[in-house]
Structures are given as C-alpha cells and as structure tokens.
Regions:
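Transmembrane alpha-helices of Major Facilitator/SLC transporters
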Residues: 64-87
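Intracellular juxtamembrane helix-capping segments at the cytosolic ends
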Residues: 129-143
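A late C-terminal transmembrane helix in Major Facilitator Superfamily
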Residues: 143-175
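C-terminal membrane-cytosol helix-exit motif in multi-pass small-molecule transporters
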Residues: 1-12, 192-198
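Short amphipathic helix-loop junctions that connect adjacent transmembrane helices
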Residues: 44-64
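Pair of pore-lining "gating" transmembrane helices in MFS-fold secondary transporters
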Residues: 22-42, 122-126
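Juxtamembrane intracellular "pre-TM" segments in multi-pass secondary transporters
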Residues: 5-31
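Structural signature of the two symmetry-related core transmembrane helices
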Residues: 93-107
Length: 204
C-alpha cells in the first residue's frame, strides 16, 4: 500500500471509460462500416471498370489491377509515415480529410482515361489510410480501448458483409463502373457522417 507524502497534492482519479456501447458512439461505427464497404467495392469494381479499355483481355486487366493495388499500398504507407506518425492533424481533421480524399479519388476513377485510375486509386487509398486511426482515436475517447477495438472490428466485418450483399444487386445494372459509383456513394455518406461528427463535437 502506498501512502501520500505530507504536502503533496492528491493524484487525479483516472477517468473511467465505459465498455458498453452508447448512442453517441454510433456515428464512428457507421464510418467504419462505410469505409470497409467502399474500399471493398472499389477493389471488386476495378476489373469491370477496366473492361472499358481492355474489353475481354483478362491478362491486361489483371496486370492493371495488380499495379493499381500496389500503388494503393504505397499511398497508404506514405499516409502512415507522412501524416499519421508525425501526428500532423487532429483526429477530426483526419476524418474530414479522409472523406474528401476518398470521394475525390473515386470521382477521378469514373473517367474512361486509364491513366486517371492511378492518381484516383492513390488518392482514395491515401484517404482510407487516414480514416481508420481517426475514428478509432475518437471512439477511444468514449469507450475503453478493448471495447472500442472490438466494436470497430465488428463494424468492419459488417461493412464487408454489406459489400457482399450489394455487389450482385449493383452488378445487375450492367454498367461497367457501377461498383465504383456505389463506392463513391458510400464515401459521400462517410463524408456526411464525418461532418456531423465535427459539428457535434464543436457545439458540445
């Protein structure tokens, strides 16, 4: 047992964080669902979108997809070491930036110009790399770390499941870029939720 020395101020009581989910945690979980769904639909939508340039040349399409996914990984690493590790932005700023970058990247990828797929995919991946740490830090302010990580993992799984449910429906449209458009819609919703989070935290 440790006793406080005479004349020393009492230590502040550490804040006790909740382990149960509250209503004000839902926007962060919705961001996680939308992010997972958007990235999954983008990756699944690359091959159909590239048929506009390569028709049925599956070898060329596969090569382009490999290059695009490799570029995505590089962009994510740049975001990690250039923005996240130096902690250049606050979590809310990261969240807003992620929404804008992901939406912008997917909007660029709607073009039929093949070369635009590369900057579009890089911008999207850069933004996606900013998103997860942002809402994880914000959620950790409200929940115990273990509880927050568990809920986010569940939300990501729900996002992948949502993507799996939407892919057959979206693909029925027959539009080559249908999945890219669906991913863009998800990132726009992500941005709207991010603005709501920013507004809520500002007025609180």
């Amino acid at each position: 047992m440790l006793l406080r020395l005479p004349g020393t101020p009492p230590q502040p009581t550490p804040e006790c964080k909740s382990v149960s989910l509250k209503r004000d945690c839902l926007p962060y979980l919705l961001c996680a669902i939308l992010l997972a769904a958007a990235v999954s639909m983008m990756q699944l939508g690359l091959s159909p979108a590239l048929t506009r340039q390569f028709a049925t040349d599956t070898t060329a399409i596969s090569q382009q997809v490999a290059w695009l996914l490799g570029l995505s990984a590089v962009a994510a690493l740049i975001a990690q070491f250039g923005v996240l590790r130096p902690q250049r932005l606050t979590p809310v700023a990261l969240l807003l930036s992620a929404g804008v970058l992901m939406s912008g990247g997917l909007a660029i990828m709607l073009s039929e110009q093949l070369w635009l797929f590369y900057p579009g995919c890089a911008v999207l991946s850069f933004g996606a790399a900013l998103a997860t740490p942002a809402y994880q830090l914000l959620l950790n302010d409200k929940l115990a770390d273990g509880a927050g990580a568990g809920w986010l993992a569940t939300s990501h799984t729900l996002g992948y499941g949502l993507c799996a449910l939407l892919v057959p429906l979206v693909s029925k449209t027959g539009v080559a870029i249908a999945l890219i458009m669906a991913a863009l819609f998800a990132t726009i919703l992500f941005t709207i939720v991010s603005v709501f989070i920013w507004h809520y935290r500002t007025i609180k």
